[in-house]
Amino acid sequence: IGEKRELKKVLEKYWAKQTDFNEVKYVAEQLKKRHWNYQKEAKIEFISSNDFSYYDNMLDTSILLGAIPKRFESLKDEELYFTMARGNETCVAMEMTKWFNTNYHYIVPEISKNTKFKLNSKKVIEEYKEALDLGIKTKINLIGAITYLGLSKSVDNSDAFLHINNVVEAYKELLKEISKLDDEIVVQFDEPLFVKDLDSKVLSLIKPVYDGLSSVASNIKI
């Protein structure tokens, strides 16, 4: 959010209709550059991209995977993003709940048996290129498929993990795009769900999911 809470302040201006989204984007770009350069100067070996968020990384992942609840389907771009998080006069916001045992709250994905996944890789690809323009090769951070589905909410009592193959296919498509960005790229899948006591069904997904993702491109290290 910035040392002086720059992101928070510009977002509040934007939500109050005191500025447009171009100023928000400008502040975000400056923060990302500053933070990447801090890490470069500190000689950090693996500097991350796609860890920045305007609001929440789980919300970013829902946008990435195209998991958009039906009530938001008429919206797009930043209006879609912030309405999913905050709601508006006609659309109820998505639920927020605690991220494990922390005081941080995330936007809970809404999944049903009819959920369709469609990759939207724009943020991931653009942030990698932004860092590369500064001479910084980043590792790309992503929330893993198992954690994403495991922390989602079923709105029709269906099993979210019925979609595991669809989510993995979206991630495979993303990895193919990522593989074209550089000769060698590190991708980090965060799976904090693995700290929990998982049932055998979920445990049985880990090997096939990551065997499949690891086989997509020889120049990607997961």
Locations of regions flagged by a protein language model:
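Domain-level signal for soluble alpha/beta catalytic cores
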Residues: I1-I222
